[in-house]
Amino acid sequence: MAEETPVFQIQRVYLKDLSLEQPNSPAILLEQEQPSVDIQLGVEATPVVEGIFEVAVTATVQTKIKDKTVFLVEAKQAGIFEIRNVPEDQMGAIIGIACPQIIYPYLRGNVADTVTRAGFPPVHLAEINFQAMYEQQQAAAAEAATSTAQ
């Protein structure tokens, strides 16, 4: 009976990858114009062994003045999660919503800290509704499957 008890535990949260580029420094630092900011987020999950998953949230933050990059930060925050005895129809939501919600605050802090340490005002990543993001991805996948089947 104990084997059937659902298990959801965080084993570890860690910074998997981080890069910062300032390709146009120092000249770009003399510009007075406000840069544009583009932020891209992604979530990926990989099974490690039976019942253990790595879930990673990736952020790419690029700031530009005109067509020149001020800085580019790419960060991947990951977590190892033990997920066992959970119904198959709930696994997607746990991996696509619950796990990223746990990891994301660490990613936000690492991005803000990296940008600040590089000498720029911090970039604060907004709160993310991972449930809405997951539902959009599921709807897009269902739509793609429907259009492929026709």
Curated annotation (Swiss-Prot):
<dbReference type="GO" id="GO:0051262">
    <property type="term" value="P:protein tetramerization"/>
</dbReference>
<dbReference type="GO" id="GO:0005737">
    <property type="term" value="C:cytoplasm"/>
</dbReference>
<dbReference type="InterPro" id="IPR003708">
    <property type="entry name" value="SecB"/>
</dbReference>
<comment type="subunit">
    <text>Homotetramer, a dimer of dimers. One homotetramer interacts with 1 SecA dimer.</text>
</comment>
<comment type="function">
    <text>One of the proteins required for the normal export of preproteins out of the cell cytoplasm. It is a molecular chaperone that binds to a subset of precursor proteins, maintaining them in a translocation-competent state. It also specifically binds to its receptor SecA.</text>
</comment>
<dbReference type="GO" id="GO:0006457">
    <property type="term" value="P:protein folding"/>
</dbReference>
<protein>
    <recommendedName>
        <fullName>Protein-export protein SecB</fullName>
    </recommendedName>
</protein>
<dbReference type="InterPro" id="IPR035958">
    <property type="entry name" value="SecB-like_sf"/>
</dbReference>
<dbReference type="Pfam" id="PF02556">
    <property type="entry name" value="SecB"/>
</dbReference>
<keyword id="KW-0143">Chaperone</keyword>
<keyword id="KW-0653">Protein transport</keyword>
<keyword id="KW-0963">Cytoplasm</keyword>
<keyword id="KW-0813">Transport</keyword>
<dbReference type="GO" id="GO:0015031">
    <property type="term" value="P:protein transport"/>
</dbReference>
<comment type="similarity">
    <text>Belongs to the SecB family.</text>
</comment>
<keyword id="KW-0811">Translocation</keyword>
<dbReference type="GO" id="GO:0051082">
    <property type="term" value="F:unfolded protein binding"/>
</dbReference>
